Amino acid sequence: MRNSAGRVYPACMKTLEFRIVPLSTEIADAARRAADAGASDHTVITADSAVGYPCRHCLRWAQPGERMILFPFAAIPAGQPYAESGPIFVHAKPCERYSKTHEYPESFRNGRVFRAYNSKQNMIDAEVVNGNRPEPIIEKFLENPETAFVHVRSVSHGCYTMQVERV
C-alpha cells in the first residue's frame, strides 16, 4: 500500500494523509530583515559542521560555511499554557521552502519528539520517535479527533522543528 507521497506501508498498516508545515517564508524573511538591521536577538553565525544548524524553512541541515540566523521563535503564542519561545535557525540567504507536504523530511527522522495539541493549543499527547519511523506516531496522533496539529521538536535541545497537520 502506498500513500500519496509514494511511501510503501504494509497492507495491514493504515495510512493517514498528513501535511508538513515548515516555517513560513514571511517569518524567515522577517528574521533576515531583523538580522540585517542588527537586532540583538537575531544572530548571524557561520555553520562549522554539517550537523547542528537545521533550517526550519527549507528543512535541511546547513553545510559548513553557510551563514545562518539564530533567533527566538514561539510556535505556541504567548498567553497560552504551552507557550514557549526557543532558538531556531534559518538560512541567512533566501532558501526554497520545503514543499513536499505529504512526505516527512528525511533529515529529521531521528532524535525528534512529537507533541500533539488540541484546538485550544493544549498538549494532549507526546512521544519520542525510536528509530527512524515517525509516520506511525504522526498517524496515531492525527487519528485522535481531538488533535488539531502536531509539533516536531529536537529531543536533545527541545527546539521547534516543524508542524504536522491532517490533510
Question: What is each of the regions a protein language model found here?
Answer:
Residues 33-110, 115-127:
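Conserved mixed alpha/beta catalytic, RNA-binding, or beta-rich assembly cores of soluble enzyme
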Residues 113-149, 153, 166:
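Short, hydrophobic/π-rich interface segment
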Residues 155-159:
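Short Gly/Ser/Thr- and Asp/Glu-enriched loop/turn motifs at secondary-structure junctions
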Residues 160-167:
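C-terminal edge-of-domain segments
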